[in-house]
C-alpha cells in the first residue's frame, strides 16, 4: 500500500472515532424575578426570590420559577415572598398577578403594607365600625363602601390570626 493510501485510510478511521458532544438546553434559573408595584412606588423590582404565595381569586397559589404563564386577579389577602434568607408577608387590598414565561412575576396592587404593621385590636374596632355602617340606614353608596371595607378588614383579621 502506498504511503498516501495508508495516510488516507488512517485519516478516515480517525474521523469515524470522533466523539460528538450533544447540544444541551440552556440553564434554567431556579429563581423567580419578582416585581411588586403600587401606583406610587415599587416594593420589589426584578428581585430574585425562591417562591411567592398569592391570594388569587381562584384560590391561594404558590408560584415558583418555570411556573405556567397566567394572569390572576387578586383578592384582599397576604402575599408571601420567600427568599433564601427568610420570608416577608405583605397585606394587599387586591390587584393582578402576571406570571411571564421567562421566570418573571409582576404583581400590581392598589395598596400594600407589611403584615407586621397592623394591630389586631385596631382591625377589630374598624371591622365593627364598618359592619355597623353597612347595616345602618345610610345611603346605598355608603353601605356598599362599608361592606367592601368590612371584607378587607375580615381578610386582614384572618391573616393576622394565622
From Swiss-Prot:
Origin organism lineage: Eukaryota, Fungi, Dikarya, Basidiomycota, Agaricomycotina
PANTHER family from the UniProt entry: ATP SYNTHASE DELTA/EPSILON CHAIN, ATP SYNTHASE SUBUNIT DELTA, MITOCHONDRIAL
Subunit structure: F-type ATPases have 2 components, CF(1) - the catalytic core - and CF(0) - the membrane proton channel. CF(1) has five subunits: alpha(3), beta(3), gamma(1), delta(1), epsilon(1). CF(0) has three main subunits: a, b and c.
CDD domains reported in the protein's UniProt record: F1-ATPase_delta
HAMAP family, per the entry: ATP_synth_epsil_bac
Presequence positions on this chain: 1-25
GO cellular component, one term: mitochondrial inner membrane
Protein name from the UniProt record: ATP synthase subunit delta, mitochondrial
SUPFAM superfamilies referenced in this protein's UniProt entry, alphabetically: Epsilon subunit of F1F0-ATP synthase N-terminal domain
Task performed by this protein: Mitochondrial membrane ATP synthase (F(1)F(0) ATP synthase or Complex V) produces ATP from ADP in the presence of a proton gradient across the membrane which is generated by electron transport complexes of the respiratory chain. F-type ATPases consist of two structural domains, F(1) - containing the extramembraneous catalytic core, and F(0) - containing the membrane proton channel, linked together by a central stalk and a peripheral stalk. During catalysis, ATP turnover in the catalytic domain of F(1) is coupled via a rotary mechanism of the central stalk subunits to proton translocation.
Subcellular location: Mitochondrion; Mitochondrion inner membrane
Family: Belongs to the ATPase epsilon chain family.
Amino acid at each position: 500500500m502506498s504511503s498516501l493510501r495508508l495516510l488516507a485510510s488512517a485519516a478516515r478511521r480517525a474521523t469515524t472515532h470522533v466523539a460528538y458532544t450533544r447540544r444541551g438546553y440552556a440553564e434554567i434559573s431556579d429563581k423567580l424575578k419578582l416585581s411588586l408595584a403600587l401606583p406610587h412606588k415599587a416594593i420589589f423590582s426584578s428581585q430574585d426570590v425562591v417562591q411567592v404565595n398569592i391570594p388569587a381569586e381562584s384560590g391561594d397559589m404558590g408560584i415558583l420559577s418555570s411556573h405556567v404563564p397566567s394572569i390572576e386577579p387578586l383578592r384582599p389577602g397576604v402575599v408571601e415572598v420567600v427568599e433564601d434568607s427568610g420570608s416577608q408577608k405583605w397585606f394587599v387590598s387586591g390587584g393582578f398577578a402576571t406570571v411571564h414565561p421567562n421566570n418573571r412575576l409582576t404583581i400590581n396592587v392598589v395598596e400594600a403594607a407589611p403584615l407586621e404593621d397592623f394591630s389586631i385590636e385596631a382591625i377589630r374596632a374598624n371591622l365593627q365600625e364598618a359592619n355597623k355602617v353597612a347595616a345602618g340606614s345610610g345611603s346605598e353608596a355608603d353601605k356598599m363602601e362599608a361592606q367592601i371595607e368590612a371584607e378587607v378588614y375580615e381578610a386582614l383579621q384572618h391573616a393576622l390570626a394565622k
